[in-house]
């Protein structure tokens, strides 16, 4: 990165820090104008993780909170809205919390974490403990919000449920102005509770907390909540009639989470890496919120931060590496029926599927059926929508190369689990390989291909398609005890796919995998064997004492394969 260029804000979610420390910032302050003009008392934005939700919440806090520093907004879109700035900038007490850290293996641990989050926020307003505008009993209640013992907040359960409402009422009373409430990652406590078995207790706590502060609260100017999922009204928003939910299918605010194509081109140009545009678009674009197509901000920023110093950098999986990806693993495991398996194959091939989407699920029902899982995949960013059929059913697709590669990785991972469970078939396949029984290798490998989800991706080059079948073979061979397996290592005059040394028997295997364009399996097999001979791949095995070496040319096309073998012995 050149001296004088703005730094890239990798992992920074503080608007104030980004502006104060001169980081590169893509202007999303137009969201402030829309919030005020389109006005809803309670706004819930649901977007996948790493799409700028927390940064936007930080931006809202910086704009509305009393004591706002106007210089933070100089040169930004909202600064041109002089009347809005005059009436709203720095005019409100703001309660701003993130529930991202509210988790634990038990309800007690999680509720203690919630006390900590709310207690620390209440600590930001120490003047309330001496405010002459509060009654003595109210000042005592405020003190109870911030009291600690041995480093832990001690507020009672009934006060915890009332805590946000109570704090908003005290702030409004002290300042004579209504309060703006910002709750980031509102659904994380429910997600963690579902994982660890105390879901009903957490639902009851969050429902009470939210209803008290959001429903008929005279001290509330408006509230903004963000999260990944829209949780059913019947679950935690019971009786809340003023809730405006803005999901990935809504056109309102469509460009304020994620980077637009123009914004990405400007960023690449600023850092003099416009030549990376094609790769960035293929790997990180493709998400559709409302009618807007956007890039994942996390991916773009991470890639650019490394690409400026490495012109040969190939796109990496940044977004998918920030999660356990348990959702996609469950999805692949649930593809038991032939219909669902063919649907996954269609998605990986770049096609769209029409599915009815439910945006108001509960965590208890997320994994009840494959139909619910489609909705979850859309909400969490593993799939995106390409338009609607009737307002309830949407055209779903994998957004980009990054997520497509994640699907492939999980498909191979599931395949390996299945191979490990079927020891009898594994033994038969390996026995056929080490004896040069090409017809049996072909039959068993075809069975394996039929068992797994096939890859017929029209968007990638042939070597990438070959890598998938290569991965299947490695997934099989990796479980064979006593076999030393090497993959894609440099040989005397080039690279070969797979080398296997069976030390106890002085047998070696050389396997070259080819993807058969247009299904020309015989021709692809011959090319594979010819490559093994011409590139002298067998030299390493001879040097290591193998006296029998089988050369395998394996050609694949979707769920078909052809196997040819040549034997050398001395």
Region roles according to the model:
Residues 11, 62-127:
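P-loop NTPase motor core
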Residues 243-244, 295-536, 561-570:
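Extended alpha-helical interface modules used as scaffolds for assembling large macromolecular complexes
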Residues 180-184, 208, 221-228:
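Structural recognition of the conserved hydrophobic beta-strand(s) that form the central parallel beta-sheet
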Residues 233-239, 246-305, 309, 343-347:
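Amphipathic alpha-helical segments of the small helical/lid subdomains adjacent to P-loop NTPase cores
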Residues 1-81:
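Walker A/P-loop-proximal flanking segment of P-loop NTPase domains
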Residues 10-19, 109, 113-161, 189-194:
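Conserved P-loop NTPase mechanochemical-coupling segment
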Residues 122, 163-174, 201-221, 537-540:
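Substrate-engagement module of ASCE P-loop NTPases
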Residues 540, 544-570:
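Domain-level recognition of nuclease-like catalytic cores that cleave nucleotide substrates
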């Amino acid at each position: 990165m050149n001296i004088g260029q703005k730094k890239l804000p990798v992992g920074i979610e503080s608007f104030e820090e980004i502006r104060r420390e001169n980081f590169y910032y893509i202007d999303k302050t137009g969201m402030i104008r829309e919030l005020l003009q389109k006005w809803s008392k309670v706004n819930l934005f649901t977007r996948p993780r790493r799409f700028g939700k927390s940064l936007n919440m930080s931006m809202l806090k910086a704009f509305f909170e009393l004591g706002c520093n106007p210089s933070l907004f100089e040169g930004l879109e909202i600064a041109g809205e002089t009347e809005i700035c005059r009436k709203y900038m720095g005019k409100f007490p703001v309660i701003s919390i993130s529930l991202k850290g509210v988790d634990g293996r038990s309800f007690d641990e999680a509720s203690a974490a919630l006390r900590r989050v709310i207690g620390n926020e209440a600590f930001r307003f120490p003047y309330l403990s001496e405010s002459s505008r509060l009654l003595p009993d109210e000042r005592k209640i405020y003190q109870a919000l911030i009291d600690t013992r041995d480093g832990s907040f001690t507020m009672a359960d009934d006060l915890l449920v009332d805590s946000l409402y109570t704090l908003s009422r005290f702030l409004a009373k002290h300042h004579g102005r209504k309060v703006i409430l910002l709750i980031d990652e509102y659904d994380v406590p429910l997600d963690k509770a579902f994982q660890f078995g105390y879901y009903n207790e957490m639902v009851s706590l969050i429902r009470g907390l939210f209803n008290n502060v959001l429903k008929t609260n005279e001290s509330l100017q408006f509230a903004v909540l963000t999260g990944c999922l829209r949780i059913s009204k019947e679950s935690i928003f019971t009786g809340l009639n003023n809730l405006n939910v803005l999901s990935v299918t809504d056109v309102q605010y469509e460009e304020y989470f994620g980077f637009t194509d123009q914004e990405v081109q400007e960023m690449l140009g600023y850092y003099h890496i416009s030549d990376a545009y094609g790769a960035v678009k293929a790997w990180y674009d493709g998400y559709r919120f409302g009618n807007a197509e956007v890039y994942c901000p996390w991916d773009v920023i991470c890639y650019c931060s490394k690409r400026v110093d490495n012109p040969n950098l190939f796109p990496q999986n940044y977004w998918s590496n920030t999660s356990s990806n348990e959702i996609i693993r469950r999805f692949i495991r649930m593809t038991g029926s032939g219909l669902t398996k063919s649907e996954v194959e269609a998605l990986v091939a770049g096609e769209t599927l029409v599915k009815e989407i439910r945006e108001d699920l509960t965590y208890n029902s997320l994994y009840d059926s494959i139909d619910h899982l489609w909705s979850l995949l859309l909400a969490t960013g593993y799939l995106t929508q390409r338009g609607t059929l009737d307002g309830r059913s949407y055209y779903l697709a994998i957004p980009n190369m990054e997520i497509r590669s994640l699907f492939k990785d999980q498909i191979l991972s599931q395949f390996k689990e299945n191979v490990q469970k079927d020891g009898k078939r594994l033994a038969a396949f390996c026995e056929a390989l080490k004896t040069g029984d090409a017809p049996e290798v072909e039959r068993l490998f075809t069975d394996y291909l039929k068992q797994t989800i096939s890859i017929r991706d029209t968007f990638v080059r042939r070597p990438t398609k070959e890598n998938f079948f290569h991965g299947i073979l490695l997934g099989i061979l990796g479980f064979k005890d006593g076999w030393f397996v090497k993959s894609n290592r440099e040989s005397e005059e080039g690279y070969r796919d797979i080398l296997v040394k069976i030390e106890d028997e002085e047998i070696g295997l050389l396997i070259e995998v080819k993807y058969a364009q247009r299904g020309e399996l015989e021709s692809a097999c011959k090319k594979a064997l010819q490559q093994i001979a011409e590139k002298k791949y067998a030299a390493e095995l001879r040097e290591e004492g193998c006296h029998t070496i089988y050369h395998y040319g394996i050609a694949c096309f979707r769920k078909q394969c052809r196997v040819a073998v040549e034997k050398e012995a001395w």
